Amino acid sequence: MGTMMRIGLTGGIAAGKSTVAARLKQLGALHIDYDALAHQIVEPGGVALPQIVAEFGPDALLADGTMNRPWIADHVFGANAAPGARERLDAIEHPLIYAEAARLEHEHPEAAIIIHDIPLLAEVIDDIPFAFDHIVTVEAPVCMRLDRMVEERGMSLEQAEARIRHQSSEEERRAIADIVIDSTHPLPEMLAQVGEIYAGWCAGR
């Protein structure tokens, strides 16, 4: 039996990363979803919430004990953001997310292949405390991603364009990846490619 293999999976919003992640999970990989972890730590009782309130003040919390997402969106990411607000929030959340990812790895010693599904991997690659055996990026043209965001996620075109602008570019993601998956291919063809990649990882362990 070989050792565990750790894979970084990334891709721009609406590029098809979730489809690739779902297929890898079906094939037997342990899937660690960083978006899910980011939501988990700011739920009522979550480890990040008290630190966020201490850093940004009581306006960051709603009366029902949940995070005030519209306020955070405006004061950390939006027009009313103070200088360095995004970095202050990241400094709270990122170490907690990494710690939770490490805990999940530790809880599954049987996992042969572990997928760290990280939308912003290119942005955090220098700080993340994990070494990856491979990094996969999933790509699609911006026009296709915009269509998906408007038609499938109910965003306005302006919202969709803003979300893409605030992420790293395809070139930046390609620079850290050794495997590129093009999600413009027909779905069966793309899933077959994912299966071939996974089989290669299993054989290489």
From Swiss-Prot:
Chief site of localization: cytoplasm
Localization of this protein: Cytoplasm
Domain DPCK, residue spans: 6-205
Enzyme Commission identifier(s): 2.7.1.24
Major enzyme class: transferase
SUPFAM superfamilies reported in the protein's UniProt record: P-loop containing nucleoside triphosphate hydrolases
InterPro entries for the chain: Depp_CoAkinase, P-loop_NTPase
Pathway connected to this protein: Cofactor biosynthesis; coenzyme A biosynthesis; CoA from (R)-pantothenate: step 5/5
Listed CDD domains: DPCK
Transmembrane segments: none
GO biological process: coenzyme A biosynthetic process
Residues noted as binding ATP in the record, renumbered to the chain: 14-19
Keywords on record: ATP-binding, Coenzyme A biosynthesis, Cytoplasm, Kinase, Nucleotide-binding, Transferase
GO cellular component, one term: cytoplasm
GO MF terms held by the record: ATP binding; dephospho-CoA kinase activity
Catalytic activity annotation: 3'-dephospho-CoA + ATP = ADP + CoA + H(+)
Disulfide cross-links: none
Pfam hit, one: CoaE
Family indicated by similarity: Belongs to the CoaE family.
Protein function: Catalyzes the phosphorylation of the 3'-hydroxyl group of dephosphocoenzyme A to form coenzyme A.
The protein's name in its UniProt record: Dephospho-CoA kinase
Gene of this entry: coaE
